[in-house]
């Protein structure tokens, strides 16, 4: 049974606001790919837009440019080894979905591969062509057109991370195959006003 529920687009950026490592999925014709990306972030609220760094020489970049969109999935700790594996090899040599037995379904808006197993959230992203930033900095911009998240940890536009769901945490790549899970969510309190002087 899937615990995934749609996320309202005004809240979609919150799915990656905390800087998790993500899985980028792409497809064009009969070719498909999945790769890991440590550098992604929201860049605009309305419409929701994201940026992700994907090297121009990668198979993923080729597919997403040809298709005009990509999937962005947030893996949980259970997918840490898989995330490292798909980020360490090229999809030009093998279909990583088949090789690693990754189950994916076409997204509802763009048809890009969406992964829910061992993931916390996903977004379908329509590529916004910015040739200068793509070529000079390998930074790709996209508009989020649909999103969903595991309702056990994301509901009403907010993450709910606590000791009761420690296995349902996003992962953050520290380099060299070392990852850290997201910590417990804590609420900031307003500070009292300061007096001049």
Task: Set out the residue ranges of the language-model regions.
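Basic, polyanion-binding surface patches
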Residues: 1-197
């Amino acid at each position: 049974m899937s615990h995934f529920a749609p996320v309202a687009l005004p809240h979609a950026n919150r799915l990656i606001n905390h800087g998790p490592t993500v899985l980028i999925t792409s497809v064009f014709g009969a070719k498909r790919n999945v790769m890991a990306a440590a550098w992604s972030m929201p860049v605009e609220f309305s419409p929701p837009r994201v940026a992700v760094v994907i090297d121009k020489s990668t198979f993923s970049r080729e597919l997403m440019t040809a298709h005009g969109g990509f999937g962005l999935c947030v893996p949980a700790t259970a997918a840490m080894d898989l995330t490292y594996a798909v980020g360490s090899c090229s999809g030009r040599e093998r279909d990583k979905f088949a090789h690693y037995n990754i189950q994916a379904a076409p997204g509802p808006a763009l048809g890009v591969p969406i992964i829910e197993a061992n993931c916390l959230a996903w977004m379908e992203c329509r590529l916004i062509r910015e040739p200068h930033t793509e070529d000079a900095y390998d930074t790709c911009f996209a508009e989020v057109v649909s999103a969903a998240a595991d309702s056990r940890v994301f509901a009403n536009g907010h993450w709910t991370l606590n000791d009761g769901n420690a296995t349902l945490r996003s992962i953050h790549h520290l380099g060299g195959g070392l990852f850290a899970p997201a910590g417990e969510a804590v609420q900031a309190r307003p500070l009292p006003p300061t007096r001049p002087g």
